[in-house]
Amino acid sequence: ISKKRTSTVLIKKIAKDFKLNCGKLANTKYPVSRIDDNATLFDIVQNSLDETLMARGKIYTLYDEFGKLRLREPWKVNRLITSTTAESYDYKETIDDNVYNQIKLAYDNTKKGVQEIYMAKNSKYINKWGVLQYFDKIDSRKGAKLKVKALLKIYCKTGKTIKINNCFGDINVRAGCLVLVKLTIYGETISNYMLVDKVTHTFNNGQHLMDLELSGGDYDSSY
């Protein structure tokens, strides 16, 4: 059960209750108000981090570091991904999955008997794609104006993902970090840091290779 506490505080409490060791934990700052029944500890923490992402537009990754829990924002790893350091790659771009250019949040003000609407939109992409609306009801209007802006920042991007196959390995690369990508795909030049969503390391006959799943929205420099 989690109520009115930041993800950082939640992780510390779970660690204390289950006798887990904590390393350095980033301060997520945003107090999450929710109750999770019949959920795993991982799901409880992930739900809290997801709410923090939607409210503040910040990604946090929780992982084990030498027996201690570590929570941090995306960090840069000194690893360059190019057409010469990888065997092959697959590229996908879509606006069909979790892409929105208009955010609408509704709060039912029972005292006044009205529904308050909070909106944010990107007119440029509405003209380009038509209206792709995200709608949700919220329990509190506190921070609603900031939340719609954060959600627009998260979702108003074409979903661009790249799968890199058999690139030179680096044990410092793990999910949640950022690697520098320099590729030309379908005439579009990518030269930016991208988020590692998933990594698989392979060690064979003294050779270290890895497969990566990367994402980066419109390959902006916000990281």
PLM features: what roles do these ranges have?
Residues G57-C156, K160-N204, D218-D220:
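Acidic, small/polar-enriched beta strand-loop surface segments
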Residues I1-T94:
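Charged- and aromatic-enriched interaction segments used to assemble
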